[in-house]
Amino acid sequence: RQGQTVYEKDADSKRYPASTTKIMTYIIAVENIADLDNTKIPIKQSVLDVLKNTGSSLANVENHVGKSMTAIDLLYSMMVPSGNDAAMVLADYIGEGNVDNFVKLMNEKAKELGCENTHFANPDGLHDPDHYTTARDMYKITTYALTLPRFEEITNTCTYTCDGDDTALVTTNYLIDANRGGEYYYMYA
């Protein structure tokens, strides 16, 4: 039966979610931006500077500083190569210049979805002792995300080229990439 747990181990143990955080960031972005294809979001150097020297995975959003990117391009930039830069730009935009406002929305949504052991401290998943979730809570978050527009489409994308870019973004999800996934590739993922 769909939705039935087949096996679980330590489903309620707190863990650091790392880049799976971006699933909640996706949720908040899609729920707060009405027109993903036409909403232009300014790319500010000050937002990207926060990620310097963090070892962050990036999606080359910096190439657009001083210009704008569409919300949909930023969502692909966040989800396909796990771009922390795109996550921060979306959070800054929706939080009206304050990423903490965005993180508050993330935590409110987690509660609304019935998450009992989740607390977010940032939109990108960089380590913070106060940034945690459980497998059970992440299941609730992901199950909800799958009901939202374009989530499945974006997360099943292996390469994507943003408007105005020459270089394609490449997925970090080896489960779906037959060319780069090697032993991790799973054709039914």
Language-model region placement:
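Active-site-adjacent loops and short helices of periplasmic peptidoglycan-processing enzymes
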Residues: 1-136, 145-146
